[in-house]
Amino acid sequence: MRRVVTLVSKEQAEVGHRFRVVEVPDECRTCRLYPVCMGRLTPGRAYKIVEVRPYMGQRCKITDGEMVPVVVEEAPMIGLVPLNKALEGVVVTFEGECAGCEGCPQQVQVGEKIKIVRVLGRAKCRGGDFAIVEFYALGPPSPSKSGGATASRDPSRAPPSRPLSK
């Protein structure tokens, strides 16, 4: 689905190799390569290498190993969604209906758009019926639809107050 160019170690740089980003080490965030390396990947998501590009001399700040540019594709995730949302090819908003059981999507935030790729089966979670689906996360949650109710108000922009009449 979503493809990005990133860097991986020379040992990982094989077409078809799959890996999961568990978390980004603090040392990576201060590295000059971070924006084109770990900065392009999302913790909790799995990736598959689809193209290996020529080595350009980059070295990892942590391991001092050779880093090779590759094109990765985000691998689909598996999780539970309500049966009424489980249609192949449909884009839905993840609302966290399933929470707390083994099949619940841990890598997706409430409000995030997901695309259902395939329906794999059925399961129960907290007494509800859910579908086991393979899906892609399409991006971060959209801004609050409450019209800014969660935003703090600037008192200098409030309408002028009027004294109460007696």
Swiss-Prot record:
Residues 140-166 are annotated as: Disordered. InterPro entries: UPF0179. Signal peptide: none annotated. Pfam families: UPF0179 (PF03684). Residues 157-166 have a biased composition (Pro residues). HAMAP family: UPF0179 (MF_00498). Belongs to the UPF0179 family. This is UPF0179 protein Tneu_1978.
